Amino acid sequence: MKRALLVIAVLVASLAGLEAQNLSKATRIGVFLSGSEASSREYLQGLEQGLADLGLVEGKNIQLELRYANGQMERLDSVAVELARSGADIIFVGGDQATSAVKRATDKIPIVAVTCDALAAGLVTNLARPGGNITGVTCINADLAAKRIEVIKEAIPSLSRIGVALNPSDKRMASELMEAERAATAYLISVQKLVVTKPEEIENAFSKAAESGLGGVVIVFDSMTFFNRAKLAETAVRHRMPTIFNFRQYVDAGGLLSFGPNLRDMYRQSAHHILKVIKGEAPGDIPMEQPTRFELVINLKTAKALGLTVPPSLITRADEVIE
């Protein structure tokens, strides 16, 4: 009996020691966000909340190492390389362009990403089995392009010409433009491409839109436009140009309309992928998930500044109306 109790005591002590050892070796998660610390705080909080819900707590069993590109797209590769060399066990990254940079920097470290369209961006070839070292949460953004055309047409029934502002060097832009053109054709709307690759081109794009007599502009998301969303909104109002965006943050900054997934929710959702990687699953075997919540947001203050009356039917359907 005494011998049995001794064996049990030794086992308990060993397990306690093992647990302490596991807790002392926190998983190092490199976090790469293409915006600034201030502009990224909401999404980082979503990620942290998702991790905490799963029992992964900063300073206890995980260690977050944060890196920001501050909206400078030319820094993406250098920051990605720095993070890949930092000794991180996992890299979490937000945005298609930043994810592409991390993918170029390492094919060994597991990557959990939140992206607009991982397929169109060439990050993976299959959502169910991503392969390689990437998994995470992604939209199929081209599918949402048609919905945005539908929404802005409902907001402006007389709309007959529209601009699509995008960065043609981004791989996924071609598919989104194609889907926007296809949807616009169904509404007898002609489409004009507007190139916006850096902040200095925003003014020119809206000047061109106004001179061409466009009735509105679809802004295709990328990290540059997201970081400069307040400038986009202000410039659009100054040129009296209605706009629609992918995410509500643009509308919070003064844009007119948005339809797309909730970004904070996507970051929170991605925590499940991080936990699976920590438990030993290969990222390439973890299916990429799609967002579960989409929202229509309308800024009536901006509509008033544009002299636009948004139809009550659209306002009724909105998830949020900013007044």
Model-predicted segments: where are they?
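Short hydrophobic alpha-helices and adjacent helix-cap/hinge residues
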Residues: 1-323
